[in-house]
Each structure stands twice: as C-alpha cells, then as structure tokens.
C-alpha cells in the first residue's frame, strides 16, 4: 500500500504531465507533489520511509516524458520557490524562477551579465543543473553558490568550484533538489542591457523554431563541432518519424508536429545519432532529458 508523507502542499495522483511540457507529449506521474515551502519539502523527504522514487520537474522546456509515465513522485517547486532578492551585493534567486524573468529583473535593475538568460527557456534550477548557456555565456560565469536539499532532507551549500561546472553538466552529487542560487552583481546600463537582450531575441526568432512545440537544442555540441552541421551533412533537416521531425529552420531542434508521441521523438533522436555516428564517427550526446517508463 502506498503511504504518502503528511504535507502542507498539494498531492495529485495519476497526474498528466503532458500539458506541462513544451513538447506536449508523455504519460502521467504516479504522484505529483507541489510543496508549500522548503520546510514542507524537507518534511516530505524525511518522512519518505518507503523510499518512493523521486524526480524533479521544472518548466518542462528541455525534457521528454516517456509515454509510460513516471513511477513514484514528481516534485515541482512552485511560486514560493521563485523569489528574487538582494542580499549583501548578491542576487538570491529561487530555483523555480524562470530564466527569462531573471533576465528582465536584471535589466530593470541595471545588472549586466544576465542578458543571455532571455534566450534560454526553463528555470534557474534547470539552468544550474545543465550549466545552460547561449551567446557566449553560461551559468558557471555568474554563479557564486547554490543551496540544495538532498533526498534525506539535509540542506547543503555548494560553491561554484564545488559544483564543478562542465559543458552542459556538473559534478554535483545525484539525488539533490536545487533550491536557490546566489549570483554576483555587476552594474551596467539598462538601455545597453535591453539592446543586447533584443539582439538575442531577434537572433533566436530568426534561427530557431521558437513558436513550435520543441524542447530547445536536442544534442550538445561535440568538442570543436556543431551538432546541426553534422545533422545537416547526413541530410536529416526536416526528417520525420511519426509526428516528430527535425526542424527545417534549425536541424538540431526536434518538433512535435501536433500528433507526436514521446516514442516518436526519442526514436527520431536515436535515429539521428545513429546516422551521424555512421557518417562522422561522432556520438551526439542528448541535451534533452528523457525520463519515465516506456509503455
């Protein structure tokens, strides 16, 4: 019998996750949990005596939920984890804050260095987890430290060096939920910051399928190479499996054309990886997370 910890937040059983993802595909979460606050989250983790499997869920922008859904508990941090505040010449930002919202906040407060976030879908927590980056900047360039909680309910702090940022990854221990990030502040000019943000937005809209059901870059760039060039070289721009296709506009982006399943998307990605490897010997690494069970 499934026994759930007593919490102040909200549980939903057999909860459909499809509508929360940018791809609009996937199955249900066995249990969906939105904690009220950090103490509620801690209480849940401490009480999880059955060791129910745990997955965290952000903005749903860089993820494929498999069609068989997710066993155990999916935790989504809500608005109470999205605050932005100034403390001792640093920005303290909740992990569920959207990258775009932080970029706009920094522009309004003449803080430079965050312009690139306007072009990165998702949350601060997800950005830290994958060292998200674009247009010459990455999270590693602006982070001072993070606060997290492990699955045993212990609050932990990691400095930039301890996080061990790498290209689209880090060396953090597994089974962590990122709660806050501390950023350094560099003052700038609001108008110049806005100009740079507009440049980034214009570049995105002209080169990426941002109005489609997509999940951002599908594959990380191999060292010294561009994934899209390798994909284009094997003629897979626009290639389709089921309801999923590689974008005609940017062939490192997968698109749900309206009737794709998670299997269509994952099969398409694996097919692209196979063809690129056969042609160039390069193993493309997924940048999009795939979680859950196959049907």
From Swiss-Prot:
It is found in: Cytoplasm. Its cofactor is FAD. It is an enzyme of class 1 (oxidoreductase). One of its GO terms (cellular component) is cytosol. It catalyses: UDP-N-acetyl-alpha-D-muramate + NADP(+) = UDP-N-acetyl-3-O-(1-carboxyvinyl)-alpha-D-glucosamine + NADPH + H(+). GO terms for biological process: cell division; cell wall organization; peptidoglycan biosynthetic process; regulation of cell shape. Keywords: Cell cycle, Cell division, Cell shape, Cell wall biogenesis/degradation, Cytoplasm, FAD, Flavoprotein, NADP, Oxidoreductase, Peptidoglycan synthesis. The keyword Transferase does not apply. GO terms for molecular function: FAD binding; UDP-N-acetylmuramate dehydrogenase activity. It holds the Pfam family MurB_C. Its main location: cytoplasm. The keyword Nucleotide-binding does not apply. Residues 24-188 form the FAD-binding PCMH-type domain. Pathway: Cell wall biogenesis; peptidoglycan biosynthesis. PROSITE patterns: FAD_PCMH. The active site is at 168, 217 (proton donor), 287. InterPro entries: FAD-bd_PCMH, FAD-bd_PCMH-like_sf, FAD-bd_PCMH_sub1, FAD-bd_PCMH_sub2, MurB, MurB_C, MurB_C_sf, Oxid_FAD_bind_N. Its EC number is 1.3.1.98. Cell wall formation. Belongs to the MurB family. HAMAP family: MurB (MF_00037). PANTHER family: UDP-N-ACETYLENOLPYRUVOYLGLUCOSAMINE REDUCTASE. This is UDP-N-acetylenolpyruvoylglucosamine reductase. It comes from Rickettsia massiliae (strain Mtu5).
């Amino acid at each position: 019998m499934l026994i759930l910890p007593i919490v102040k937040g909200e549980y939903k059983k057999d909860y459909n996750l499809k509508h929360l993802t940018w791809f609009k595909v996937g199955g249900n979460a066995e249990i969906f949990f939105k904690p009220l606050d950090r103490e509620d989250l801690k209480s849940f983790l401490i009480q999880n005596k059955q060791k129910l499997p745990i997955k965290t869920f952000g903005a749903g922008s860089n993820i494929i939920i498999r069609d068989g859904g997710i066993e155990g508990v999916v935790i989504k941090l809500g608005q109470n984890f999205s605050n932005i505040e100034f403390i001792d010449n640093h920005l303290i930002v909740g992990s569920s804050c959207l990258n775009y919202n932080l970029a706009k906040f920094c522009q309004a407060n003449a803080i430079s260095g965050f312009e690139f976030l306007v072009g990165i879908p998702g949350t601060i927590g997800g950005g830290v987890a994958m060292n998200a980056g674009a247009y010459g900047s990455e999270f590693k360039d602006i982070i001072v430290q993070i606060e997290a909680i492990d699955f045993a309910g212990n609050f932990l702090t990691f400095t930039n060096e301890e996080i061990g940022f790498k290209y689209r990854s880090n060396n953090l221990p597994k089974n962590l939920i990122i709660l806050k990030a501390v950023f350094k502040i560099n003052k700038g000019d609001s108008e110049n910051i806005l100009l740079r943000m507009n440049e980034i937005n214009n570049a995105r809209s002209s080169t990426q399928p941002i109005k489609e059901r997509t999940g951002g870059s599908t594959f990380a760039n191999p060292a010294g190479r561009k994934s899209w060039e390798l994909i284009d070289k094997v003629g897979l721009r626009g290639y389709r499996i089921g309801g999923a296709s590689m974008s005609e506009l940017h062939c490192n982006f997968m698109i749900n054309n309206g009737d794709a399943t998670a299997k269509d998307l994952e099969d398409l990605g694996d097919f692209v990886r196979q063809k690129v490897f056969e042609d160039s010997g390069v193993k493309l690494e997924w940048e999009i997370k795939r979680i859950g069970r196959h049907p």
